[in-house]
Amino acid sequence: MSAPKKVVLAYSGGLDTSIILKWLQTEYGCEVVTFTADLGQGEELEPAREKAVMLGIKPDNIFIEDVREEFVRDFVFPMFRANALYEGLYLLGTSIARPLIAKRLVEIAAMTGADAVAHGATGKGNDQVRFELTAYALDPAIKVIAPWREWDLTSRTRLIEFAEQNQIPIAKNKRGEAPFSVDANLLHTSSEGRVLENPGEEAPDYVYQRTVDPEKAPDTPEFVEITFEKGDAVAINGEAMSPATILTRLNELGGKHGVGRLDLVENRFVGMKSRGIYETPGGTILLEAHRGIEQITLDSGAGHLKDSIMPRYAELIYNGFWYSPEREMLQALIDKSQEHVSGTVRVKLYKGFARTVARWSDHSLYSEKHVTFEEDAGAYDQKDAAGFIRLNALRLKLIATRNARVKG
């Protein structure tokens, strides 16, 4: 394959992606286009523009975009309709952001006439897979460059030397090894590596950046009411909000009460186990509330089927198959299940916990007259249960009879 002439780089403005930018220019002699996404990571992004210009990028080749609303509306919310948890615990905060970034890389490549895209994911992690599967799903002819799999800059010392040789500014706090690496967006903050690599040691307090220590959270609980329409949150405490605004507000509430901390050893798609510290305050509240509204609006058959496919759906997202036909097929089933998932849930926030305490809906299937312990005025005839039990017991009785005969 011929060397690329123009490359769109996923660019944060940090030291590593600045080194990648310069490496692409020197190694491939290509024109570089940068894309920086505002996913709600909480960083000022204009310095990324200034740094790109300083490194020789034409102003027209610098793309900085606020994609927070698209991220929550088109990626986070569809995932939350499924109550997706990878390995029963992980809310997929990093996994769900990668398809959007890769999608924009491919779209910008088409807009600018670039023939390749590049990312800064290492050769050991899942992100390289997620970026590249998305790129190839959207443009089979695109070339993907993964510098960490190609170059010889295999140590922090070599990276610093390359930066100094190429006049790339290095902040004083970037010269040494960071105690851990951080990835953040509006859904979560992920911390991995170095001081966290020994799973037998508790993570130090300074790792947590988005949530207060639950033991130091307010001594008074706080209640929040979340309104849903067809499975998506649309209002908080009666106030209609955009998707990104809802998640931002829930992050503030959850962080204040120490909600959403997770210390997890997970199975990476590439074959190894890794330890991560995840903070997902708003997402944890949202998941709890969504489950709460489903409890009264979703039929048991549909709900149990939906629960059974959730692990596979979550695994597809974790492994990078957002744009696969099987994920889209499952999404259609999940979205169908949400047609009546509308109503309001009250969640109690207290010292690390988010717990549903009330829920109501015009679409509710809950019938108090059927379930009451008091007189039900004929709504339910308890004698009907006898035939129901006899029919369900029939096969068990036949099995027991057979077993007794065989043993005899």
From Swiss-Prot:
Per the UniProt entry, the Enzyme Commission number(s) are 6.3.4.5
Q: Which UniProt keywords apply?
A: Amino-acid biosynthesis, Arginine biosynthesis, ATP-binding, Cytoplasm, Ligase, Nucleotide-binding
Pathway given in the UniProt record: Amino-acid biosynthesis; L-arginine biosynthesis; L-arginine from L-ornithine and carbamoyl phosphate: step 2/3
Residues bound to L-aspartate are T122, N126, D127
- Top-level taxonomic group: Bacteria
Q: What does the similarity note say?
A: Belongs to the argininosuccinate synthase family. Type 1 subfamily.
Query: Which NCBIfam families does the protein's record reference?
Result: argG (TIGR00032), PRK00509.1 (NF001770)
- Cellular component terms per the entry's GO annotation: cytoplasm
Which amino acids does the record list as binding ATP?
A10, Y11, S12, G13, G14, L15, D16, T17, S18, A37, G120
**Protein residues bound to L-citrulline:** Y90, S95, N126, R130, S181, S190, E266, Y278
Assembly, in brief, is: Homotetramer.
Q: Which reaction does it catalyse?
A: L-citrulline + L-aspartate + ATP = 2-(N(omega)-L-arginino)succinate + AMP + diphosphate + H(+)
* Top EC class, one word: ligase
Keyword ATP-binding in the entry? The reply is yes
Q: Which organism is it from?
A: Cereibacter sphaeroides (strain ATCC 17025 / ATH 2.4.3)
Q: Name one GO molecular function term.
A: argininosuccinate synthase activity
Name of the coding gene: argG
Q: Where in the cell is it found?
A: Cytoplasm
One Pfam match, by short name? Answer: Arginosuc_synth
> What HAMAP family does this protein map onto?
Arg_succ_synth_type1
GO biological processes: argininosuccinate metabolic process; L-arginine biosynthetic process; urea cycle
Protein name (Swiss-Prot/TrEMBL): Argininosuccinate synthase
